[in-house]
């Protein structure tokens, strides 16, 4: 719909919900920390935002937004900002597309396609050193969150969740291979962050430690 007034015009998108819901074959799902918004990605590239009502014994979900932009099935969904009231997410599809969304209004903040970087797992991590300080250290987004990603490549990639740019890469000097899984954590009695990764090599599992300074 286009609203005109004088010499200016405003394009207002409108969505009409029919009697029957659209087909939505879920390929990825994520519940925001406040447990009020559920995000689901589908095999056709659409992302649904659901309003969750957990006041009763049975959780009721009502569709609120349909986010359109991906052209391939969604593989990963992760938060892009920290805190209990965080409302930014990042979605990644199997053709390398990445989108940063605002879940309050459904707005797309940034999108990029990174050829050769097909993510299969994304973990959003905020170092304890930046929590509560309001700082933006390490070239991270406004919340201090980094996205750690692995997939069909030999490294663990750290990305900025809002600009969707690569900050740094972690790779093994010995027998580099696709990383099957990983976890970022701050061990007890340590002042640095550690990435524990597991890769496939000759059908065996190798655990590798990467220390983040």
Per-segment meaning from a language model:
Residues 35-39, 84-90, 99, 108-110, ...:
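Structural hallmark of WD40 beta-propellers
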Residues 21-31, 71-81, 117-139, 176-187:
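Canonical WD40 repeat/beta-propeller blade segments in eukaryotic WD-repeat proteins
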Residues 47-51, 98-102, 157-160, 202-208, ...:
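WD40-repeat beta-propellers
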Residues 41-44, 92-95, 150-153, 198-200:
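Conserved strand-to-loop turn within each blade of WD40 beta-propeller repeats
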Residues 15-21, 60-69, 108-114, 168-173:
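Short C-terminal beta-strands that terminate individual repeats in beta-propeller domains
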Residues 1-27, 43, 48-56, 99, ...:
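Intrinsically disordered, low-complexity acidic/Ser/Thr/Pro-rich linker and tail segments
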Residues 3, 116-120, 130-135, 153-155, ...:
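Terminal intrinsically disordered, low-complexity extensions flanking WD-repeat/beta-propeller proteins
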